Amino acid sequence: MSVSAVGSFWLSPSPGKLPRPRMVVRSSAVSVAPILTHLQKQCATPLPVLRHVADAMAADMRAGLAVDGGSDLKMILSYVDTFPTGNEKGLFYALDLGGTNFRVLRVQLGGKDERVIATEFEQVTIPQELMFGTSEELFDFIACGLANFAKKEGGKFHLPSGRKREIGFTFSFPVKQTSIDSGILMKWTKGFAVSGTAGRDVVACLNEAMERQGLDMQVSALVNDTVGTLAGARYWDDDVMVAVILGTGTNACYVERTDVIPKLQGQMSSSGRTIISTEWGAFSNGLPLTEFDRDMDAASINPGEQIFEKTISGMYLGEIVRRVLLKMAEAGALFGEYVSEKLSTPFILRTPDICAMQQDNSDHLDAVGAILYDVTGVKSDLSVRKMVVEVCDTIVKRGGRLAGAGIVGILQKMEEDSKDLIFGKRTVVAMDGGLYENYPQYRRYLKEAVTELLGLEMSKNVVIEHSKDGSGIGAALLAASNSKY
């Protein structure tokens, strides 16, 4: 979480003059303390608020399972109904495509006794022009990367005659899944605008590209990263029932009984269970929102959507803090008479920045001062730095506690259908994502909310565990447990 040094102000050249800092004069001299007090009041998450969020999450889940479009939560069927058992043997691969890089992973499985014998992975950067090119160009590039990865094995691994290598495909874009190994791309996100893929089966696109490369590989499982995390964690621990990713974005999935999913219309899996991807970022019921949240949402590319994600995930926490500080600067002269225009730049203050400020234990909060100056171009004394840390803590506390309430909502929904099968025994929630992994205060607030909602005794049965990079291995394991051979 290093913070790069940036100049103090945006420089704007004037004709015939040297560039000089552009400043904005504060609008009034209102005291800053009432702004903080009001913010803390609006962001407060006492037990009744947490309970409402958990109850509403469970109700929205139930409505989303009843019928497609029944609630804000899509409750997407993963078609994963065969879970890794530990008996899987052989060589399996995973391909993780979710951003500007893709990752290839090879996993050698040795069955019950040896489990995961070896893993190797490689990361490849996708050239920017391919993010705006054709479907064939993108998938050919990915297949070429897979072929190069396989070539480096140098004949070390041999498959029985007539068998193809099997791959689990983690595809973190909106997909309408139609089976364990097929899914129709709904739309590209995350800066991709590839032509010729929307409405097509992404597994077919990859399989065809691998054939063009002469690669003896085929996709056995298509999963999103949250489902992969659950499968990867469950391989080691049968008590894993829920997986949550808290990173730039957020999602949660869980193990559900197929007989309580009305929209399945009687289709049952062989195991009687499946993994449901909640798509909980779209949840919005009863959240404690502020003017800063509403303004940020209105200015976003998807106003009115993904409200839970905008309140709890790493993409947005730093931006909410920036908006609060800007108001304090303009209305209360927090940083003196003038305001740096850099502070008016959306998303210039990132969640790693506010995390680094909250880790500063020095007497004069030197790191806080340095980050404020380097990132937003403002100077600060100790009292200002303390105020800034209070703002960070207020936003992060709300985010962590709401995420905890969301987890309890999922557990409540599961408990309603399976009395004492969740709260009556050890239940593990597998967590992954940079926000959860790297922000200790966020982690603490999340766990405190879970304990408050469940009570001390019941919360002892709920284990919240970090499952680092579980989605890649999870995809390979799902390829193994759904092997075509």
What are these regions (language model features)?
Residues 172-177, 226-229, 433-437, 469-471:
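Short, internal active-site loops enriched in acidic
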Residues 249, 259, 283, 322, ...:
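Short, glycine-/Ser/Thr-/acidic-enriched flexible segments
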Residues 102-107, 228-232, 243-244, 250-256:
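Short beta-strand scaffold segments in enzyme catalytic cores
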Residues 92-96, 164-168, 221, 241-245, ...:
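Short glycine-aspartate micro-motif
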Residues 2-165, 236, 293-485:
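ATP-binding/phosphotransfer module of carbohydrate and carboxylate kinases, centering on a glycine-rich
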Residues 123-143, 147, 175-234, 238-242, ...:
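Glycine-rich phosphate-binding loop and adjoining helix at the ATP-binding site
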Residues 160-218, 224, 237-238, 248, ...:
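Gly/Ser/Thr-rich active-site cleft segment
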Residues 170, 223, 255, 432-434, ...:
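Generic beta-strand/beta-sheet core signal
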